[in-house]
Structures are given as C-alpha cells and as structure tokens.
Amino acid sequence: MAGQKIRIRLKAYDHEAIDASARKIVETVTRTGARVVGPVPLPTEKNVYAVIRSPHKYKDSREHFEMRTHKRLIDILDPTPKTVDALMRIDLPASVDVNIQ
C-alpha cells in the first residue's frame, strides 16, 4: 500500500475522551511502522439552545444550554497491512465517533 493515505476523523462531546483516543491511535500506528500526521485539532462546533424556564409565561426568563462537539484529524501515511489490522482491532470508547476514509 505504498503511497496511500488513511484519514481518520474523530468527533466527541468530551475533549478528554477524544484526546485519549487520538493518543491511542497514534501509539498503535507508530508501533506498526507507519508515519502519522496529527492529531490536528479542528474547530469546535458549539450549539446553544435557549429554553423558557417557566411552563406558562415569563418569556423573558430563559435558560441557555450548550453542546460542544470536539473534532480531531489524523492522517496515516504509507500504511502497512499490519497497520490496518491493528486499527481494526483497537478498542475506543463508545462516546467517540470514528470516521475512516
């Protein structure tokens, strides 16, 4: 698989879980002999929701909730078959969304 590239995108709400998962992927890939670029932090997506506190009136009184989505990008250059096998077997938390291209 010379000259090829694997791109891994990670998404999670918890920044500690995504950083630990990225660290685990980088350690696994470097152990198998492939080159790694990253993890590159991508912009954090922030969704803010305003909810009326009262069930009936007082529309001016609102409560704000936010949800942050953290993203990381990892590129694996010149992956070996051993690298691909190790990536398939890696155990990551369920809270981290992994997209492999």
UniProtKB/Swiss-Prot annotation:
Transmembrane segments: none annotated. The keyword Magnesium does not apply. GO terms for cellular component: ribonucleoprotein complex; ribosome. Pfam families: Ribosomal_S10 (PF00338). GO terms for biological process: translation. PROSITE patterns: RIBOSOMAL_S10. GO terms for molecular function: structural constituent of ribosome; tRNA binding. Keywords: Ribonucleoprotein, Ribosomal protein. InterPro entries: Ribosomal_uS10 (IPR001848), Ribosomal_uS10_CS (IPR018268), Ribosomal_uS10_dom (IPR027486), Ribosomal_uS10_dom_sf (IPR036838). Coiled coil: none annotated. Signal peptide: none annotated. SUPFAM superfamilies: Ribosomal protein S10. Belongs to the universal ribosomal protein uS10 family. Part of the 30S ribosomal subunit. Involved in the binding of tRNA to the ribosomes. This is Small ribosomal subunit protein uS10. The gene is rpsJ.
